[in-house]
Amino acid sequence: MLVLARRSNQSIMIGDDIEIVIVDIKGDQVKIGVKAPKNVSVHRAEVYKEIQEENKKAAGTNIKPEDLGKLGDLFKKKT
């Protein structure tokens, strides 16, 4: 792991198009901003882990393709 020291309003570049900015420092809390292209997902680690867990659960379900078609039909009827 690369460890860098930064002060408020200083930044770190990752590649050519991702910038991490130190927005504010108060006590033991650091606020950071992330400037990245829209196609790059940015999540807090705990949120990312939850997303991964939910994706694993969803991948393990046994939904039949014909059931998905029926679900789509229900949505069409309501509009």
Swiss-Prot record:
Main location: cytoplasm
GO term, biological process aspect, one: negative regulation of translational initiation
Annotated Gene Ontology cellular component terms: cytosol
Compartmental location: Cytoplasm
InterPro entries the record matches: CsrA (IPR003751), CsrA_sf (IPR036107)
Parts of the chain that traverse the membrane: none
Keyword Cytoplasm on entry: yes
Any Pfam family the entry gives: CsrA
Molecular functions per Gene Ontology: mRNA 5'-UTR binding
UniProt keyword Cell membrane, yes or no: no
Keyword terms: Bacterial flagellum biogenesis, Cytoplasm, Repressor, RNA-binding, Translation regulation
Subunit structure of this chain's protein: Homodimer; the beta-strands of each monomer intercalate to form a hydrophobic core, while the alpha-helices form wings that extend away from the core.
Alphabetized NCBIfam families for the sequence: csrA (TIGR00202), PRK01712.1 (NF002469)
Protein role: A translational regulator that binds mRNA to regulate translation initiation and/or mRNA stability. Usually binds in the 5'-UTR at or near the Shine-Dalgarno sequence preventing ribosome-binding, thus repressing translation. Its main target seems to be the major flagellin gene, while its function is anatagonized by FliW.
Family, per entry: Belongs to the CsrA/RsmA family.
Name of the protein in question: Translational regulator CsrA
Organism whose genome encodes this protein: Leptospira biflexa serovar Patoc (strain Patoc 1 / ATCC 23582 / Paris)
Gene name of the record: csrA
